[in-house]
Amino acid sequence: MTEPRPQPSPREAVGPAYSIEAIRKAQAKSWEALHAVAAIVKPGMTEAQATAQGQAILAEMGLVRNWHPLLIRFGQNTLKIFSDRTPGDTVLGEDDIWFIDMGPVFEGHEGDVGATFATGTDPAKQACARDVKLLFDRIKAIWDGGKVSGYDLYDAAQAEAAALGWVLNLDIQGHRVGDYPHSVHQGGKLGGFGQAPSPGLWILEMQIRHPTEPFGAFYEDLLA
């Protein structure tokens, strides 16, 4: 007897224009944009200066819409989550850590990318920037491997982060994307999703912090 096919969750609803090919393309363009912005960020800049120059680069690339603003965080501000705001006057140091988070819209589909970089040679900050990507890759590999819920992904992430020597920030636990605007579907957090996340609909976010020092790292990408 054939088992009934599970019903799709309302939390994975999409609009009529959505296609997985289009969202993958939007994500690829978002990564291209992120690396273009990252290339201009240098020690001595303030967050506000880096953000303004980054926005100019995005405009030159033809970006006309974001579903969330460009965020660039330096130093201790890498501990802050998306909803936190900073005055913009923090200066990037010679031995420092920083990240970019951007949410552009390309051809009606939402990209969302984030990555961390380190300046200089500070070993702890270099390791933090490296390990947040390693953590992301390990958790994505769990998702790649089979039917694992969003709950389970973030349970695993907490354990993996601790094994690497970091503390996982569970105030952010991933979210939906889709054809713009995904917010109409009220998808909630990936870490609160009790089913296996479908490809092309969810952003896996990892934010870690040093257990005692005031800095952290961030990485996010599409599960697809």
Regions found by a protein language model. Give the residues of each.
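Active-site neighborhoods and metal-handling regions in enzymes and metal-associated proteins
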Residues: 1-224
